[in-house]
Amino acid sequence: MATTVKDTMNVDINAIKKGEIRMGTTITALRYKDGVILAADSRTTMGAYIANRVTDKLTQLTDNIWCCRSGSAADTQTVADLLKYYLSMYRIQFGHDPSVHTAATLASEMCYQNKNMLSAGLIVAGYDEKTGGDVYSIPLGGSLHKQPLAIGGSGSAFIYGFCDANFRENMTQEEAVEFLKNAVALAMERDGSSGGTIRMVILNKDGMERKFFAIDTANPIPVFTH
């Protein structure tokens, strides 16, 4: 009997080093008119100590699928690495790229099967020529939610009102970039575990584009007066 990708998903999480470094984090993703955009801050903390100010919390899984990571840095890096491995196996076995739904389902199953040992919240998003852009949220515990807009991490609690008031479907790319930039910047101002810079990934029929926003650069982070 042929071995499937799912048959190989027997991961010994106990063998994975539990890291103290955590990504308190603000992670977001949305579906816009032509694809999807993912965005995140870049602060990594260890208790009250800021361990890294420029962490890249956006991880490429395939050519057209990326994920945002929040929770334990060690756990989420390992989950993302395993996802990349399984998705590459899927392509070899079936002869075509996996769909965003397939990638999100694998991530959800991995997190659910090990929910008592992992501290990992993910957003999986990507572009598929058949379905367009898709966004899936996988919070702690491993449940799977398909949404036009997903937010997660400690900073998300501070921007639900902003997102409810300002998000709308079928935004243009420019509108979507501005919306996510403002959302993450607002979370960074209020959440002590979010900060640093803002990184984005835009996925559409033309491929992938990355954006970077930082203080005192040509692409500055928005500053809000109180």
UniProtKB/Swiss-Prot annotation:
It comes from the Eukaryota. It is found in: Cytoplasm; Nucleus. One of its GO terms (cellular component) is nucleus. GO terms for molecular function: endopeptidase activity; threonine-type endopeptidase activity. Its main location: cytoplasm. It holds the Pfam family Proteasome. It catalyses: Cleavage of peptide bonds with very broad specificity. InterPro entries: Ntn_hydrolases_N (IPR029055), Pept_T1A_subB (IPR000243), Proteasome_bsu_CS (IPR016050), Proteasome_sua/b (IPR001353), Proteasome_suB-type (IPR023333). It is an enzyme of class 3 (hydrolase). Coiled coil: none annotated. Its EC number is 3.4.25.1. The active site is at 25 (nucleophile). Disulfide bonds: none annotated. Keywords: Cytoplasm, Hydrolase, Nucleus, Protease, Proteasome, Threonine protease, Zymogen. Residues 1-24 form a propeptide. GO terms for biological process: proteasome-mediated ubiquitin-dependent protein catabolic process. Belongs to the peptidase T1B family. The 26S proteasome consists of a 20S proteasome core and two 19S regulatory subunits. The 20S proteasome core is composed of 28 subunits that are arranged in four stacked rings, resulting in a barrel-shaped structure. The two end rings are each formed by seven alpha subunits, and the two central rings are each formed by seven beta subunits. The catalytic chamber with the active sites is on the inside of the barrel. The proteasome is a multicatalytic proteinase complex which is characterized by its ability to cleave peptides with Arg, Phe, Tyr, Leu, and Glu adjacent to the leaving group at neutral or slightly basic pH. The proteasome has an ATP-dependent proteolytic activity. This is Probable proteasome subunit beta type-1. It comes from Schizosaccharomyces pombe (strain 972 / ATCC 24843) (Fission yeast).
